[in-house]
């Protein structure tokens, strides 16, 4: 409300999987919402290509870049989906087009649509619940190690930041990699003030045994069980 009172729009970046548990951004007053669609059934693929998601309130639809899928009916009265509100520039003047989406992104958008249709609301809720529960378990286990602490004491979904009190994150993560475990992402490579921190992500695919193995491995590098 504070943003809208001064004429500003509210933009939100969200994790699509989290909506299996949380309210939609639009229900919280968000005007434009963006997301990385990689979590919707796409494997790692050596870092890409992936797909982006962007949605907004109806009054802004015609200003969206990209291709917009709309619902209509065919001549037999059956529901179908089409690319709608397409400008002429998308087909005849590429330099002025708002969308130059290539086949790669189209294929991954289709993959995401298939994944969502197969999962359904119940499936997405189950995946989101598993992500949240397993991440919470991993964070609680990390908090038992004297060497580490949670850097941000805020609610989280499936990612959390761990601080290494010995400030030796590169060596710590290399130690884990040498044992074929990707323990986390060092944040110091982007933010100098987070040089002693790394990000851990836990999804529905990780087992309790794998989480316990990670915690044990990190503890064996000098953390020690408390």
What are these regions (language model features)?
Residues 40-146, 150-153:
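Active-site C-terminal subdomain of aminotransferase-like
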Residues 116-119, 164, 218-221:
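Generic structural signal for hydrophobic core residues of well-folded globular domains
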Residues 1-82, 146-147, 162, 170-176, ...:
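Conserved PLP-enzyme active-site core in the AAT-like
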Residues 3, 12, 104-106, 122, ...:
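Solvent-exposed, charged interface segments at domain starts and junctions
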Residues 122-214:
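Conserved C-terminal alpha-helix-loop-beta "cap" of PLP-dependent enzymes
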């Amino acid at each position: 409300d504070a943003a809208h009172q001064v004429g500003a729009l509210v933009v939100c970046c969200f994790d699509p999987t989290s909506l299996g548990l949380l309210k939609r951004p639009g229900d919280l007053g968000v005007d434009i919402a963006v997301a990385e669609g990689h979590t919707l059934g796409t494997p790692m693929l050596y870092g890409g290509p992936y797909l982006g998601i962007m949605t907004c309130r109806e009054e802004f639809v015609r200003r969206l870049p990209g291709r917009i899928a709309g619902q209509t009916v065919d001549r037999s009265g059956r529901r179908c989906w089409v690319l709608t509100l397409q400008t002429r520039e998308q087909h005849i003047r590429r330099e002025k087009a708002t969308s130059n989406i290539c086949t790669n992104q189209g294929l991954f958008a289709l993959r995401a649509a298939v994944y969502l249709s197969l999962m359904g609301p119940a499936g997405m809720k189950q995946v989101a619940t598993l992500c949240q529960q397993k991440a919470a378990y991993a964070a609680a286990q990390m908090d038992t190690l004297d060497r580490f602490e949670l850097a941000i004491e805020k609610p989280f979904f499936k990612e959390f930041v761990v601080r290494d009190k010995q400030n030796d994150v590169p060596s710590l993560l290399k130690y884990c990699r040498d044992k074929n475990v990707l323990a986390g992402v060092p944040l110091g490579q982007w933010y100098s003030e987070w040089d002693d921190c790394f990000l851990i992500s836990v999804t529905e695919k990780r087992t309790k045994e794998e989480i316990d193995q990670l915690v044990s491995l990190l503890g064996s590098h000098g953390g020690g069980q408390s």
